[in-house]
């Protein structure tokens, strides 16, 4: 499953009452790290052998066709602007979440949930669960 969440310092206040309610208290059960320079931190993850996948409208492959069984980081942008060009450029792969009809993008929570479900499913199969 997920072992932690990394956010930019420019993100919303994680301990704002609305945020805490939205997480249903999970914010207290999941380690998180706020980073000042996300691109530098992403480079450190890559140096440590962690594969990085960015949810991106320019992704040419489906998120479903990727292997998430090894050390993995999923990059999700904000709802207004998506990922910065700098972060998207540092990801190992840009992937898409296929959508039907006129839907162009999903909010960050939904995109994150879709990825986490896929990662969990792949790892459960690998472990024979």
Feature-to-residue mapping (PLM):
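Post-transcriptional modification and biogenesis factors for structured RNAs
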Residues: 1-129
């Amino acid at each position: 499953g997920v072992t932690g969440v990394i956010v930019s310092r420019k993100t919303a206040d994680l301990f704002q009452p609305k945020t805490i309610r939205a997480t249903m208290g999970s914010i207290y059960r999941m380690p998180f790290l706020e980073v000042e320079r996300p691109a530098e931190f992403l480079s450190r993850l890559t140096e440590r052998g962690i594969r990085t996948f960015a949810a991106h409208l320019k992704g040419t492959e489906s998120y479903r066709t990727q292997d998430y069984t090894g050390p993995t980081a999923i990059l999700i942008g904000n709802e207004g602007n998506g990922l910065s060009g700098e972060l998207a450029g540092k990801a190992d792969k840009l992937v898409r979440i296929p959508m039907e009809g006129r839907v162009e993008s999903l909010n960050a929570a939904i995109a994150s949930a879709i990825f986490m479900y896929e990662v969990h499913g792949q790892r459960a199969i690998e472990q024979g669960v």
